[in-house]
């Protein structure tokens, strides 16, 4: 799998308007909700106006956004925000902004403080979220937010108060007419055309295992571990440096590209270790034209998803976390259903060979359960795709929280519908 001619990676902070090849949405009937329709918002009795809904999936690495009913997001925008210090802003005068998002981060001559508003998938900096959404509405999509309903994804096990924050920001700052916020895991399962299953999601900053039955998260059973794709990238950089290369945090966008183009999960890592360099190596051309050779690092980096102790983490590996969750489903009566529908989601699961390795490890841990692992080709955007399906269904329209409802009932309106 030579990558010598692979395109140079784009710097972090790129607003990527080309989401790639379009897929197809599962039939709404398959998702367990019958009929499709436009978003309809009741503003006054006997008066209904149609509104085009937006779907926003705010991830630790990228914010995916686009219109409901589309097969894939329109934009992938970096979740990193560049901030000028007060001193830098004062020196720059009125000609420079204080905050930079998306393509604005490219080719910046002045150094910026880079801020990621999410920690392990959960929002910790709401000012940056506002900056990102302003960029989405006004720069990327060039829309008036007060003319669109917005569906927002929320990670499992995040504070319930975050849903209130989403509502306050969207209604009070952007003046949107309606919103809904729902679990990322629930949206992911809809992307598979299912309403029941065990969602195993690993993105950039966090991984979850969430059992869902008929559209409901089974209470007390979702599990989370605080490692994911960014940890794999950092581990790959460590392995490459141990092999004699000299990468630093400034080169993480290059390491990320190497991970996507060169790395894989070995089905039998012990056998892979015995292979010679001539059987394993690939050449990779760096942006400056230098060519490096990558060997065992190609598959060794992914081992941390199965043995997190390799990166100093005491939490269980993804197969073990999944097996434990399955065992806990025994008392609910849903174990057999969950084992038959183990659904991989998130960008970290896109690593070549990962589904097969995960299936093997899980089968060894649960020999009596005969677990069946599914890996949809478009699972990198499973959360957004599920949101696109959900927000376009006629049966869902009654679950929008309108601005009027929020003004009248406050946060109670959110919890009654979301």
UniProtKB/Swiss-Prot annotation:
Tissue specificity field: Testis specific.
Q: Where in the cell is it found?
A: Cytoplasm, Cytoskeleton
The chain residues annotated with the modification Phosphoserine are: 8
Keywords for the protein's UniProt record, in alphabetical order = Cytoplasm, Cytoskeleton, Phosphoprotein
Q: Where are the transmembrane segments?
A: none
One of the record's GO cellular component terms = cytoskeleton
Pfam families given for it? Actin (PF00022)
Spans annotated as Disordered: 1-42
- InterPro entries annotated for this entry? Actin, ATPase_NBD
PANTHER family listed in its UniProt record: ACTIN
Family to which the UniProt record says this protein belongs: Belongs to the actin family.
Q: What is this protein called?
A: Actin-like protein 7B
* Species name: Mus musculus (Mouse)
Q: Which taxonomic lineage is given here?
A: Eukaryota, Metazoa, Chordata, Craniata, Vertebrata
